[in-house]
């Protein structure tokens, strides 16, 4: 069984895959999310993994291979060490030198985030055409793949929760507001007005940027939304997103693993 791990700045999303060598990818058997702790040790990660697997009737011994992508530099080595100690193998860590199967057409390929690359791999594998991936996490990233399966680059903007935090931390009279659905476009309270601004503001950003990217590509490329916060605005408040795929990054990790093992 294959363990696929996506370590984000805010959350870590991971799952197990049975029959990972099957063409096009095996079935994702189980998956979990937990808060990313930047000071986690290999032993803490191993204990957490053992406990979560046990809740689903699984054991560490059933995992015979793994792959990790991490946007938190200090946690990649800890996951690799955890795999050595608790799983008994060397994990694949997505980074420079890893075979992705796509050409990276950016000025500095080494600076492209691992999660963004595996999203691009999954998008092209699924659609075999130009594609746009919108990943809603700590930041909102837009990544573009060409008709030839090349990673062309993308766009990074502050995420919804970062924007909320900036409002209440920089504006003295504004309250702390949790991300949530607005009751109406025109807010009747300060909280409603803030939620409306975040949700409709980011929905407008998504539709505007996706439209411009399609014009740049010269095609009606499919737009795929993913990430832990996507459900707050997609598909209810957006018009440009074709598909919501919460598992896109994990699917991409499995594909990259296949190309390296």
For the regions a language model picked out, list residue spans one by one.
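Short glycine-rich, Thr/Ser-proximal phosphate-binding strand/loop in the N-terminal lobe
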Residues: 1-51, 149-175, 180-181
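Short glycine-aspartate micro-motif
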Residues: 2-6, 67, 131-135, 224
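ATP-binding/phosphotransfer module of carbohydrate and carboxylate kinases, centering on a glycine-rich
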Residues: 2-5, 36, 40, 166-261
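Short beta-strand scaffold segments in enzyme catalytic cores
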Residues: 12-17, 133, 140-145
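Short, well-ordered amphipathic alpha-helical segments that serve as non-catalytic structural scaffolds
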Residues: 44-56, 205, 209-210
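Short beta-strand-loop/turn "lid" adjacent to the catalytic site in phosphate-handling enzymes
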Residues: 54-112, 148-154, 159-160, 188-199, ...
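Conserved phosphate-binding catalytic cores of ATP/NTP-utilizing and phosphoryl-transfer enzymes
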Residues: 100-131, 254-261
């Amino acid at each position: 069984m294959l363990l696929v791990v996506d370590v984000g700045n805010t959350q870590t999303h991971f799952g197990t895959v049975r029959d990972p060598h099957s063409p096009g990818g095996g079935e994702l058997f189980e998956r979990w999310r937990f808060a990313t702790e930047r000071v986690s040790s290999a032993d803490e990660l191993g204990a957490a993994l053992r406990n979560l697997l046990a809740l689903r009737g699984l054991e560490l011994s059933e995992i015979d291979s793994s792959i990790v992508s991490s946007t938190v530099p200090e946690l990649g080595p800890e996951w690799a060490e955890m795999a050595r100690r608790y799983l008994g193998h060397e994990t694949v860590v997505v980074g420079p030198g890893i075979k992705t199967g796509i050409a990276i057409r950016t000025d500095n390929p080494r600076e492209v985030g691992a999660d963004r690359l595996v999203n691009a791999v999954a998008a092209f594998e699924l659609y075999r055409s130009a594609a746009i991936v919108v990943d809603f996490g700590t930041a909102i990233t837009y990544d573009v793949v060409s008709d030839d399966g090349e990673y062309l680059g993308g766009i990074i903007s502050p995420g919804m929760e970062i924007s909320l935090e900036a409002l209440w931390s920089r504006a003295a009279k504004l309250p702390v507001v949790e991300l949530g659905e607005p009751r109406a476009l025109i807010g009747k309270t300060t909280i409603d007005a803030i939620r409306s601004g975040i949700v409709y503001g980011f929905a407008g950003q998504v539709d505007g940027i996706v439209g411009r990217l399609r014009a740049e590509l010269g095609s009606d490329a499919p737009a795929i939304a993913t990430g832990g916060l996507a459900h707050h605005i997609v598909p209810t408040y957006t018009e440009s997103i074709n598909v919501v795929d919460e598992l896109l990054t994990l699917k991409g990790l499995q594909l990259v693993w296949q190309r390296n093992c």
